[in-house]
Amino acid sequence: GLEHAEFFRYGVMHRNTFVDAPHVLDATFGVPGTDVRLAGQITGTEGYMEAVATGLLAALNTYAEAIDAVPLSLPRTGALGALVAYATDPETVGYQPMHVNFGLVPPLDDGNRRSKRDRYQAYADRAHAELDAYLGSRSELFPSRA
């Protein structure tokens, strides 16, 4: 299929253009002093699911603002909460684009040694429990959970 292809240049990776999110965005992915929210690759969050998730979070926070509700601040123990914290924490140094990964999630503090599989399951169990409790406390945004 590529026998007649002409290559313009070899060895060039794609180039990401992204804002210095920790210094220009608030925790809702908003640009302070404006009505603008950003999401996806431009914020330095990489990946298709990360783009969808940050877009949904930006939309939910826009809705929260419209109904005069407190913005969502997801627990850092979950994938999206940890990614948002990394992307919007002004203390982040040398900001670079990032996928969701377990390195962003706070460690388990129970002192138990686990296999990788069991550790990841413990991360998931903790994240699910904290997210469920948090969303249950936000009935103004999620009335069906009340």
Question: Where on the chain are the PLM-derived regions?
Answer:
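Internal hydrophobic alpha-helix adjacent to the cofactor/substrate pocket in enzyme cavities
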Residues: 52-74
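Predominant activation on well-ordered alpha-helical scaffold segments within soluble catalytic domains
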Residues: 53-60, 84, 128-132
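C-terminal auxiliary extensions adjacent to catalytic cores
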Residues: 97-146
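Short, well-ordered loop/turn and helix-capping segments at boundaries between secondary-structure elements
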Residues: 48, 61-68, 85, 89-93, ...
